[in-house]
Amino acid sequence: MIKSKSYFTLTKRSVKIFAIFTLLACGPGMADYDEFMSFFMPESSNATAQNQKYHYTPMMFYNDNEGEGQSFPNDTTDLTKLENLQAWTKYCEGKIAQKDLEKGIYGSIINSKLQSFFKSYNNQLAIDYLIFVQEAERIETALLNMESDSVKYKNPANDIKILTQLLVRAKHDFLKERIAFQLVKTFSKAKKYKEAVTAFNKNILQIKDKSFISDWALMRKAESEIALGDTAEAYYDFSRVFERSQSHRNQADLIARYRILTFPKEAIKFCKNNHEKASLYAFAGIKPGIDGLPMVEKMVELDPQNQMIELIMAREINKNEKFYYDQMYAEFNDDETKKTVKLEQERATDYWSKLKEFSIKCANNQALPKTGFWQTASAYMEYVQGDYAKSVEFLNQAKAIKTTNEGLKNQILLQNFLLISKKSVSITPEVEAEFLPILASFSNPKNFRMSNAVLESCKILSAKYRGVSGVQKTESKGGWFSSCSNKKADTKILANAPHAIAKAYLLTMLTTYQNNSSQEYGNFESQKDMFLIEDTTSLATIEKVIAYFSEANKSKFDKGLQKLVGFDNDHLYTLMGRRAMNEADYFKAAEAFEKVSPSVWKSDEWKYFDEDPLYIPTKYNRDKKNLNYNPYTFAKKMAELEAKLKANPNDAQSAYLLACGTYNTTYEGNSWILRRHSWSSGEVNSYSKGKYDTDYFQTDKAKTFFIQASKSSNQELTAKAFFGAALCERDAYQVFLLQQEANPDETQEVFLARMEKVRANKYSEYFKILHSKYQDTKYQKQVLLECGDYSLFMGEK
């Protein structure tokens, strides 16, 4: 018989099905690891490529493997080494070859050309300094690589003595700065934090011509200050490193992010001027959990030309989006989380007004750079709050400002995209003409916000095509097009939009990763699964889509939309055949499958249509090979059987074969692929709230045919029919069981006993009939020997 559902073991069949599911249903991995529902691109700010790393993310830390800026994700430049070599080149006045310099500094100074160079200038101090640093580096590397047995531990006291002596000999600021840095570092690593701070103040501050090395030393001072509890000064010092040090800015941010969770306001007293104050507020503004609006307000007041201002504002907009919009997978939240989310949404709704007020003020502030950012941000927040006229007004102002910022250009385009779909009362050719070019430009979106915009705009316009006045926050579990007439249609919308349902469907297809992603960028979390939508779409909808593709007089929009989706006749008619099979319209299924190229049935997907669709075995793994049918010939056979049964309702053999064929296209059948793209043993469960009351899962249609066949005068055929009906009951029970959960006060044993009562009372009628009335048939005896479920049932009796 067909196997009982196994959810924790992989049988031969489940391995095969898993392979199909992976092949057909899984797209490439998510392109962005921290996606959320957002439409405002932070790239629209004037932040430098280096600062773009600090765009808002829901995560606590950034992905350090992506490089310093999003514009250079593959940049693996060792900034520390680069800075250092440039400094040494300047110190040597360019009189030694770069490769010799690098070997002497990052290899070994002993017997190197760099050593000879320094000797020629009587610079023994430089040689001694490099010998010390290279030995320290060698030991540190060995310890990190767990090679401690092969090296001697450094003696901090001895190192401090050596560095102090070297410092006394230093006359040039270049070497003095480096030796002082090593001294501060050694004190800090030895946990002599007060001495580290003192060494910095005594030796680094007096250096007139400071380089990046002073900022490296400042990092060590700040770390020591944290250990001493001086968080305010440490925060200030980290902010200076963040602004000035190309190589250590990320480290400064991470340590402050991890060690100082709140902004110490006392840090402001260490700032020497307005620029430093603004930089301090910027450093605070990029931290999670910090209210950035007061920070950016201060920055505008103190230093309106600061390049972090727009970035901080973009962060606040993105942060508020995170709380304002329903985020992906919100349906899995528990009740307590839902309450928290609701409160956050209420706060975010109020916060939009504050952000918008500040943004509009900045749009009119002549002291700020005229980039178009503030007009664009104001337009977006007017859109969020539903004032589309004002949004258009601000967006037009933004368009009038010349910019070379591609991120800002894309944001303006994105907002225009949203506005077209949202503000349009009805669908007209003019609306379609305006919508299409932007839709085409967002094809294969390059970031998740573009993907979100495609989803939102297509969803809104799709709803209007269907005559739905409002857009639901979540789709029905039956799919967007499983019932296109479940709401009262707006005749004005439909009257102005020929092929409205077909257009709505195709727009939905553009929200899927199969149709709107690429190998380069992968798919996004907001994108839908085309196969799941197709598997829940009505036959009537697909017929409308085919009629739309067959239209002779196509508009530019029609041609463009159909080209973007890219469906050919094979795809459309295969889908129509599947949906007809799902609705047991075998004549239309045959009609559709006949129009599919025979080569399609030879593709990898259809190699799994390899078991006889008109045969139901009594024992698992006793399936017959499919030697006679492809989808077209099988659908044709089913249509013929149905016609014979209609002509003669007493034709039990036709009823039985029709029942077998119908059963095999259900969830537990061997030919489910004639209805669905994919199959999973975990598809039915209690947590995803799927739509399981369909014939695909409940097998009602097959059971009806089996019962009709059971009226045969042939006892063996009748026994077969009742066994088939019993399988339908069993499958329905499995679906019911897998949706249930134990009550809080129930043990697993009590829960299973309760479920067993349900099975016995509601889902075992036909096993009972087979046992009580047909136990003398050969077929019943065969079933008793071979069918595990029936044997269990008999054991209970």
Q: For the regions a protein language model found, what residue spans apply to each?
A:
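N-terminal secretory signal peptides that target proteins for export/translocation
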Residues: 1-11
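Generic alpha-helix initiation/capping and coil-helix boundary signal
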Residues: 12-15, 714
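Bacterial N-terminal signal peptides
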Residues: 14-25
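Extracytoplasmic/secretory-pathway proteins
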Residues: 26-185, 190-797
